C-alpha cells in the first residue's frame, strides 16, 4: 500500500519512483493498493480513476499509467466523485477503498457527527454497500471501505452494514491497533478484512523489540515484525 504523498514530496523523481514501486510489486505478484485518497467530480475524478486504475487514451492508443489494483477514495463530494472510479473498476475489474471511519484521532470531528441521530460514518457505510451492489465480484464487491483498527466497536457496526465489502484496516501497530481489536472487521468465515501495517513493518528496526537487528539488517527486522503480526491476528481470530 504505497502512500503517494511520500513520493509526491520529491516532485517528478518521486512520482517516477512511485511508478517503479508499483511495477516492482506487481512483478513480485503482489496486489497493489494505491493510497492516493483522491476525491473530485466529473472529468477530474475520471482522470484520477483512469490514471491510477485504468488506461489513458493518447491519440489512437491507450496505456496504463500507474496501474495499481486498488485505490483509496475520499467520498466527501458524494456519488459524483465515486461513480467515475466505479466505471473504471467495472471495466478493469479493479477496486477502490472508500474512506468511512479513519484511524486518526481527529476523524470524529466530521465522521462522528450525527444526522437524524446516526453518525455520518454509518451513512457513508450504507452508501458504500449500495455502490457495491453495482460492482460485484465473486464474493465481494469492487467497493471496499477504510475503517481504522483504532475504532473496533465502530468496525463491528460497519461490518454488519457492509457484509460484501472488503475492509481495509489501517492503524495496526504504530497507531496502537492490536490483533484483539480486529476480530469484528472480519466476516464469520475469517475473511473480508485487509489489515495494514506500514511504519510498524518498514521501520521495525527502530522499535525496541527489534533493535537487535540494527539498521543494516532492516529487512530481517521487518520479517520478524510481519511474523509477529500474523501470529497476533491469527491468535485473535482463533
Predicted features along the sequence, with ranges:
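Glycine-rich, proline-tolerant flexible connector loops at the mouths of alpha/beta enzymes
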Residues: 1-15
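A C-terminal functional module that forms or caps the active site or interfaces directly
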Residues: 145, 149-196, 200-207
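Acidic (Asp/Glu)-rich catalytic clusters
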Residues: 22-27, 86-92, 159-162, 183-190
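Hydrophobic faces of well-ordered beta-strands that scaffold small-molecule active sites
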Residues: 2, 32-34, 71-73, 96-100, ...
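Catalytic PLP-binding core of fold-type I/II PLP enzymes
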Residues: 16-40
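Active-site beta-loop-alpha junctions enriched in small/polar residues
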Residues: 3-7, 37-41, 74-76, 101-105, ...
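C-terminal helical cap(s) of enzyme catalytic domains, especially alpha/beta-barrels
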Residues: 182-188, 203-238
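Conserved anion-binding
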Residues: 36, 40-144
